[in-house]
Amino acid sequence: MTKIGIIGAMDEEVELLKSKLSNCSERTIAECEFYTGTIEGKEIVLLKSGIGKVNAAIGTTLLIQLFQPTAIINTGSAGGLDSSLHVGDLAISTEVRYNDVDATVFGYEFGQVPQMPAFYQPDDMLIDIAIEAAKTVGIPSKKGLILSGDSFMSDAALVEQLKRRFNYPLCSEMEAGAIAQVCHRFGVPFVIIRSLSDIAGAEAKVSYDEFLETASVNSANLVLAIVGRLG
């Protein structure tokens, strides 16, 4: 039976998904909250990991080791970097990179953790399913690069630097890189789904405060559509 791991960082990002779980049971380990149950007959392990890369890595490792999911979907909000995307729109990962790692003095690419890949490749089948599912939720979507780092992108100069440094990033957020790296190490297929709560830059916090719930619901609705298409 397919067992799908779904990861969100905050209450807002898992609330809708938790409400859809049948026969839900809860377990907390190292402050990571796990909710197990079913959605549309599929076995689900929903994790609220906490915010940031280390929390995400801890939670993802526990999820894989304790529950052995066949695939992992990461859901949540992000700050937009692509001018064609608007608040509430959806981003589907085709690659994931860190935006706050610099070992270039040793010949690595910017964003590349030493001895690790320069970027992390989501599962092709999950990407295709996400793209098809996005057509049914009535929200504009785009596939591409998602950046990840332990900073909220409210510095306009830093945002412009990231846009110059990376090729056409869709958005930036704070957990996906760690989740992708852990999935890579364990060989678990994954895809990252984000909805924009803000446009990264000086006004990002104001938008984030207003639209976090909208972004969280939009991302969760796409995850539900993906779950419905998984075998």
UniProtKB/Swiss-Prot annotation:
The active site is at E13 (proton acceptor), D198 (proton donor). Its EC number is 3.2.2.9. One of its GO terms (molecular function) is methylthioadenosine nucleosidase activity. Pfam families: PNP_UDP_1. Catalyzes the irreversible cleavage of the glycosidic bond in both 5'-methylthioadenosine (MTA) and S-adenosylhomocysteine (SAH/AdoHcy) to adenine and the corresponding thioribose, 5'-methylthioribose and S-ribosylhomocysteine, respectively. Also cleaves 5'-deoxyadenosine, a toxic by-product of radical S-adenosylmethionine (SAM) enzymes, into 5-deoxyribose and adenine. HAMAP family: Salvage_MtnN. This is 5'-methylthioadenosine/S-adenosylhomocysteine nucleosidase. It comes from Halalkalibacterium halodurans (strain ATCC BAA-125 / DSM 18197 / FERM 7344 / JCM 9153 / C-125) (Bacillus halodurans).
